[in-house]
């Protein structure tokens, strides 16, 4: 097992050290015609801005390093999907669906919403948000909008959508803002780790299948990262006598159960359950673990604290309006109590695009070229 991890790290180093933590200028033409994004605050780029929600990031210093400033992204600069869109060659970032007008929908849309989950009630403790079911329904509406630009020719629209990439990153909030919040939700009483993961997978299968029914053929499905080790959890467990370390391993163990089921789901979908589709699984748990454990190799000096936040690990309270963040965000793995920095997002996007170290069964570049 140690040899395997060594080989993975060497391969990732070869990928990452061949690049700076910037994304090159887009190519003349994008490798795919459009990119559709479904997810939570890790990839939300402004859909929550006008909602009555605590899950918003439309204030400084969020966006301090982003060319357009504060937009609603939950980081200092680009999100993972921003970096991915640039690598794919898009001239502009994929806009939030809440602000798309006219033919812009033909290049894709971002439906992601902070606090969203696979389950509809997930994130209700934080206020309004757009759940995965709601995001999928918004996408079906978008498909109807797109049809007019194909003169009502559904076959032509299907051929167009079959060349696009669909990204889905869900599950984190189903644990952080549902299963492991017993004072607000009853799921931990009604389920155990195994049955809760099975329930999520059942719902997720239906959601991904509906995307397929409305044209999705090249689909990226991410696992959940090592969220038991984010600054918020480290702050809570910092002073506890925990023989396994400062992370909340109870959460991590539950995530491993879920991720195992997501990877199996990808296998099932690729083996003919959805004809003509190709799904790629991103192992976010392994990639975030390796970035944290080997942070110095990737230029990170701080891997256990947020760049912006309050309290232990800058994780007891997340980044506040007009708070002064750390001066050099490139040295931090985490931007706030929950979310990675732009630097981490770019590293992860590049590794997933060019390497199979954390992708299965192929990488994103190979998916785009299908």
Curated annotation (Swiss-Prot):
Q: Tell me, what is one Gene Ontology molecular-function annotation carried by this entry?
A: hydrolase activity, acting on ester bonds
Question: Which top EC class is named for this enzyme in its record?
Answer: hydrolase
Any Gene Ontology CC annotation? extracellular region
Active-site residues are 41 (nucleophile), 336, 339
| EC number from the UniProt entry | 3.1.1.-
What are the record keywords, sorted?
A: Glycoprotein, Hydrolase, Lipid degradation, Lipid metabolism, Secreted, Signal
Report the record's Gene Ontology biological process terms: lipid catabolic process
User: Signal sequence: where?
Assistant: 1-24
Q: Name one Pfam family in it.
A: Lipase_GDSL
Q: Which InterPro entries match?
A: GDSL (IPR001087), GDSL_esterase/lipase (IPR051238), SGNH_hydro_sf (IPR036514), SGNH_plant_lipase-like (IPR035669)
The similarity comment for this entry is:
Belongs to the 'GDSL' lipolytic enzyme family.
Q: What is this protein called?
A: GDSL esterase/lipase At1g33811
Q: What is the lineage of its organism?
A: Eukaryota, Viridiplantae, Streptophyta, Embryophyta, Tracheophyta
């Amino acid at each position: 097992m140690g040899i395997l991890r060594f080989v993975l790290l060497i391969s990732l180093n070869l990928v990452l050290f061949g690049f700076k933590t910037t994304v090159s200028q887009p190519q003349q033409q994008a490798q795919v015609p459009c990119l559709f994004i479904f997810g939570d605050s890790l990839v939300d780029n402004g859909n929550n801005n006008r909602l009555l929600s605590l899950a918003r990031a439309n204030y400084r210093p969020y966006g301090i390093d982003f060319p357009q400033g504060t937009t609603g992204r939950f980081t200092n600069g680009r999100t993972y999907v921003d970096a991915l869109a640039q690598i794919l060659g898009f001239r502009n970032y994929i806009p939030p669906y809440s602000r798309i007008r006219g033919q812009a929908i033909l290049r894709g849309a971002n439906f992601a919403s902070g606090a969203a989950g696979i389950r509809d009630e997930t994130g209700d403790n934080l206020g309004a948000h757009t759940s995965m079911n709601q995001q999928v329904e918004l996408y079906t509406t978008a498909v109807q909008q797109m049809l007019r630009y194909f003169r009502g020719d559904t076959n032509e629209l299907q051929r167009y959508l079959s060349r696009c990439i669909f990204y889905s990153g869900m599950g984190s909030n189903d644990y952080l803002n549902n299963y492991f919040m017993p004072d607000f939700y009853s799921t931990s009483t009604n389920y155990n780790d195994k049955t809760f993961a099975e329930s999520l997978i059942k719902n997720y299968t239906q959601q991904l299948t509906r995307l397929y029914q409305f044209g999705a053929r090249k689909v990226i499905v991410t696992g959940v990262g090592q969220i038991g080790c984010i600054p918020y959890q480290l702050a809570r467990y910092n002073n506890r006598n925990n023989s396994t370390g400062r992370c909340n391993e109870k959460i991590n163990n539950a995530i491993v159960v879920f991720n195992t089921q997501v990877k199996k789901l990808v296998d099932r979908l690729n083996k003919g359950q959805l004809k003509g589709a190709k799904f790629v699984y991103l192992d976010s748990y392994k990639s975030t673990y390796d970035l944290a454990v080997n942070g110095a190799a990737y230029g990170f000096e701080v891997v256990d604290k947020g760049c912006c936040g309050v309290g232990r690990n800058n994780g007891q309270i997340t980044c506040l309006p007009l708070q002064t963040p750390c001066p050099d965000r490139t040295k931090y793995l985490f931007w706030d109590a929950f979310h990675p920095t732009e630097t981490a997002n770019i590293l992860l996007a590049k590794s997933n695009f060019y390497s199979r170290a954390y992708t299965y069964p192929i990488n994103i570049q190979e998916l785009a070229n299908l």
